Amino acid sequence: MSATTHIDAPALPKRGKSKPFYKVLYVQVLFAIVVGVLVGWLSPHFATNEWIKALGDGFVKLIKMVIAPIIFCTVVSGIAHIQDARKVGRVGIKALLYFEVVSSFALVLGLIVGNLFPVGHGLAAKPDAGAVAKYVDQASHMSAVDFVLHIIPDSVVGAFAKGDILQVLLFAVLFGFALMALGERGHRLRDVIDDAAHAVFGVIAIVMKAAPIGAFGAMAFTIGKYGPAALGNLIGLVALFYATSALFVVLVLGTIAKFVGFNIFKFIGYIKDELLIVLGTSSSESALPQLMEKLERLGCSKSVVGLVVPTGYSFNLDGTNIYMTLATLFIAQALGIELSFGDQVAILLVAMLTSKGASGVTGAGFVTLAGTLAAVNPALVPGMAIVFSIDKFMSEVRALTNITGNGVAAVFVSWWEGELDHDRLRANLSRNVDPSDVETAVTTG
């Protein structure tokens, strides 16, 4: 019987080979953002050139192009290594129930904080509706029935061509079950899919080298278009989002962790290396393989980790959920649009659906935001251009919250299944773990 397969991520740094600070991606991105602010402030005419704007838009598109193959490979791999089909269904139901409850807490928290601290008031922005038209086209309004039917693709090729995550996810689940049913005959194809995932993560590593260019273009264009005065409100939104995400991790995830029997801060320390990878890439998927390996070493069931973590990257994005409701309120405040209690309930209900299509890759949360705004009030959609400039700042914390949330989810579902090794959990969280001990590898037994 084969052991669980895990996929190397090329972003994992080797110990003992410290880069010069100017070669660190996060430093480069911060430098690019500062330069973008200066260019937008000192030369607004140049900064609003369509080619400058295209730098930011192009980077987001580069990231989005690899979302579908990543989701397919990780979900198929997770399911294909489980031998009991009934267990897949049982674990899946428990995971989805957990995802829905915790995601709802994140969405509600964003609404509460956004109402208590209306940092968008006074911005009085009047953005161009065409600035974000391409995002709106990908997130058109649909009814609940349309949403369910939309999950079923007209063709598998079409699902991948359009990059529709929920359609790809459905096919991946079915394909994983079919591969699992093949038994030994399916092992060769399963290994091919694992190898394909290696290549996709390699593409991400290449694309992320362009992150500073994308950040420069997005920031320069926004400051050039709206002026440096917009920074005050935007910084307020960033600070509020940081604080809300931290509150969620400590209050909600911390409570869940305590219920299971571990300390959330020790858990964060345990996955600190994965968090640093995420911080440098602003993509929670860049650390997915390492996270899965560490969760198994922590005492979680291999089969639970293989199913819960990849699925959580579409269904359990806590940071993205907080961002969606908080950003929606900020945009409404900035545009001077009053949202009634009924409107905000609608935001919550719509976001509970649209958030399930978000992926843990940079830019996906922004597209999902378009779907929420278009469904609640189309007049809010042009305001997305306001927050796009600072999306890089918020993307970092979104990704950090997402990966922490998915890690806690795997531990909780393993505990719920009665397959959590509490002795290993306590032992690993009570000591520092060398990153070299958790190098991921493809293993077969």
Curated annotation (Swiss-Prot):
GO CC field: plasma membrane
Bilayer topology term: Multi-pass membrane protein
Subcellular location: Cell inner membrane
UniProt GO molecular function: fumarate transmembrane transporter activity; malate:proton symporter activity; succinate transmembrane transporter activity
Source species, domain of life: Bacteria
Transmembrane segments: 24-44, 62-82, 105-125, 163-183, 201-221, 234-254, 322-342, 370-390
Entry keyword set: Cell inner membrane, Cell membrane, Membrane, Symport, Transmembrane, Transmembrane helix, Transport
Gene3D superfamilies: Sodium:dicarboxylate symporter
Biological process per Gene Ontology, one example term: L-aspartate transmembrane transport
Family in the record: Belongs to the dicarboxylate/amino acid:cation symporter (DAACS) (TC 2.A.23) family.
PANTHER family associated with the record: AEROBIC C4-DICARBOXYLATE TRANSPORT PROTEIN, PROTON/GLUTAMATE-ASPARTATE SYMPORTER
Function: Responsible for the transport of dicarboxylates such as succinate, fumarate, and malate from the periplasm across the membrane.
Name the record gives this protein: C4-dicarboxylate transport protein
Organism: Rhodopseudomonas palustris (strain ATCC BAA-98 / CGA009)
